Amino acid sequence: MPATSKVAKTAKPVKKEQPKKAAAFFDVDNTILRGSSSFLFGKSAFERNFFSRKDFWRFAWAQFRFIWKGENNNKLASLKDRALSLVEGHRVRDLEILVDEVYDKHIKLKLWPETVRLAKDHIAEGREVWLVTAAPQELGDVIAKRLNLTGAIGTKVERKNGILTGKLVGKPIHGPTKRVAIKDLAKNRNLSLKKSYAYSDSHNDLPMLTAVGHPVAVNPDKILTRYAKAADWPIYDFKKRELKANRD
């Protein structure tokens, strides 16, 4: 008997893997804006009677130290914790109104135009641009939205029934946690970290900076300046330009 012919199965087309896109990750405090976004958040909270005058002056002193001495892990952690605790017991809607006010009254006046231009250049060249900040997620979201950036990765505050508990969800987005956060984002959004850029002023962000193919130091502290020079990274110091402009 003749052999029964077998109908060849149609081969399924091989699904081509989409090429990975690049992104640019920007720290916020002293990189996108001068000073601490959490302090500016606290200032607006004080103006809305969220906390006492005593707490306000503690914030003011912390801001002074931050601007002139740079980040300090212990001081920064204390500042972030205090800022987050201010929202305990308040409605989520109140926080949303507050962060809009923070941007309009304070943050937009303290933006570094040069860094904002860098971020917008990345957008124009087809890259995603993400803010990576220890400030509350809601504040990061507002800054990203107002600047027409892709989005923000920030510290998340727990919500229950429309009320803020003042407790963190996960860890503050600071130091090594920033590296973990951008790696998770890259995996979820099919981004190539090797093709990506990262910008920061602080040596505390070295874990994030060294996770990408194109790290850039912006208004760097002393430790980051030394590291960036040794590694031959681009360095932008907009503080010196501002001081020179003020003298002219």
What residue ranges belong to the model's regions?
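C-terminal cap/substrate-recognition subdomain and adjoining C-terminal extension
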Residues: P2-K21, I97, D104-D248
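Active-site neighborhood of HAD-like aspartate-dependent phosphohydrolases
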Residues: P13-K69
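Conserved active-site and cofactor/substrate-binding residues in soluble primary-metabolism enzymes
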Residues: S36, H90, T177
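Active-site phosphate-binding/coordination module
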Residues: R48, V92, T155
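Small-residue-rich anion-binding loops in enzyme active sites
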Residues: W68-L79
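Metal-dependent phosphoesterase signature
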Residues: A77-P113
